[in-house]
Amino acid sequence: MKAIYIILLSWVCLCAPVAAQTETDTIDSFSHHMQHLQEVTVTGLTGTTRASHSPAPVSVVAPRILQETSSTNIIDAVAHQPGVSQITTGSGISKPVIRGLGYNRIVTVNDGIRQEGQQWGDEHGIEVDAQTVHSVEILKGPASLMYGSDAMAGVLVLHEQPVMPQGQMRATVGGEYQTNNRMWDYTVDFAGNKGGVVWNWRWSQKDAGEYKNKRDGKVWGSQFREQALAGMLGLNRSWGYSHLKFSTYHITPGLVEGERDETGKLLPSEAYQKIYHHKVVLDNSFIIGEGSLKSLIGYQQNRRKEFEENDELGLDFRLHTVNYDVHYVSTKDLWQWSAGISGMWQHSENLGMEFLIPSYRLFDIGAFASVTRNFEKWTLSGGLRFDHRHLHSDALMDDGEERFEDFSRNFKGLTGSLGAIYRITSQWNMRLNLSHGFRAPNLSELGSNGEHEGTFRYEIGNHSLSPEHSWQFDLGFDYSSRVLSAQVSLFVNHISNYIFLQRLDANGDNYQYMAGDARLWGGEVSVDLHLIEPLHFENTFSYVNAVQLHQPSESRYLPFTPAPRWTSDLRYDIIRDGRVLNNTYVSLGMECYLRQSHVHTANATETETPSYTLFNLSAGTDVKWHGRKVASVFLNATNLFDRSYQSHLSRLKYADGPGICNMGRNIGIKVLIPILL
């Protein structure tokens, strides 16, 4: 709690001398209102740059797309983007996967700092209220230099609502209902900007029952309840801005155990989790010379309790994290450069009756610098980052026996990126990027020793693990015309000391972390056709091949590699700008997942997944009254034909017996009501 008081005191001291100023300059920390890639601004590389000037593969999920999407959490909302997938445990717990890599190989950024919970766990989701997310930036590969270790697969940057224009106030009331799991989702938002004093407050609540499908019926233990409160108070002045943000998030998800009776019917599950995530962030930007000095300091506390039957407490973790980031960004003529330091301090405590990982302390610091130069036909970009991480694990005696031993490890690593964009013609672009990534093994991989409730296994760490190092090469082509836009993004990624969890024997539940060399290659293709103005035919294809080198056939493929995926959406804009209705559309979508036969079969770790195809239907409109938007209404039907299927990335596929299928048909209706005050 001391960290919270320090941040609050720092903000008060900063703002007090300028509270009497009357400037009304509004300085947005980022701009992401445009949906076209050429106009989108991205912030997760090393500063702020246009996406069209980034050699590294990057995509942006625009605010309207998030509004039109029916999902159960923010990862579920972006998991249909090319190259992005999700590992799920039921309908309420999702973990992001980028080009076949997930867990601690992806950094999720929220409120400007990296989100730190217990992301090493299979059934540990991302503790973020989806209602607070305005847009999402997806960086693929280790090209980002701002976050150091763990950003090997990429970065998900969750952007909050932009600051309101000067002199305006707005309230928003929203609600959504989904039929399959009877989920109700409510949110209330109040934001404004008066005389450069800016604020944004939001409350959200989500209640969901057990989801169901045609084969398993009701999936006991898949229910969840979520509550969140977030706020921002700040100053926008001619010298820059200072924003103080806070959030508190609480979710109570059930844990699907998958046990069945003699008739094959699923039995009720009493296991569940309680997770609390509290955060406070001081975000400052000062205009100095021809650039800006940006500083962020944040404190997070993540508390995770896992209960078994009869409310018996098992695992109980409390994680404290202090994040810091100071960097300078300058743009002059055709040059842009940035340099800074960032890192974090962590302390994790074991407070439960059962133990999986030891208590530990971690300190992480990194320094980075990057430069970009624009020419008539070329954009050249490059940068380096050096990281140092110290980890100390505490010993623990359990019933007179040593459960965890005391040990310390130090890790050092270099991250780098060198890329170019060549503008072949006004319609064609080519992108090249070579990047080097680094990831230190996490405490779970080094020191686990216990049964993990909800994962169906006993996990064993490996003290001898070394850091992962990767080299990734990206090649991309963009084409844009009046009737056709297309993107091709190809990659190859070689990882040394790739860490994975392998089953020790075919009939047991013991798993241990191992390491080896891996190679991933694949890419994404997007083709959008607009033969007539109101009709859009959008297609994507994603593929990744992930293998371990120098391994026998049964352990050749990396576990949890996404199946090849083809998506098509046919959308018709019925009314663009009517007297009462605006942006009215109807859309028919298809998701085709090909057979995944590239599986890690050693000791029955994985099984093949057959192909399946899902159809979705959606519609939406804005409603106007006297020329002003008074409501937005969206209708979504997913898995329209109620197909029984198991995703290759669903952990419930490996529940007892035949496993458990994903959600059946689901119809959702969402209403958003903006109120300008």
Question: Language-model features: where?
Answer:
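Short strand-turn segments of transmembrane beta-barrel domains in outer membranes
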Residues: E160-G192, V219-S222, E270
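Gram-negative outer-membrane beta-barrel transporters
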Residues: F491-H494, Y513-Q596
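Extracytoplasmic beta-strand/coil segments of soluble accessory domains associated
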Residues: V58, I75-R114, H134
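Short, acidic, small-residue-rich periplasmic hinge/interaction motif at the N-terminus
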Residues: T22-Q67, Y103
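Outer-membrane beta-barrel signature, preferentially recognizing the C-terminal barrel domain
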Residues: T263-D283, E405-R423, N429, H436-Q487, ...
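Flexible loop and strand-edge segments within Gram-negative outer membrane beta-barrel domains
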Residues: E23-T26, A208-D216, W220-E226, G240-N323, ...
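Short acidic/polar hinge/loop motifs at secondary-structure boundaries
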Residues: R114-K140
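C-terminal beta-signal and adjacent terminal beta-strands/loops
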Residues: F438-R439, H494-S496, F537, C592-V599, ...
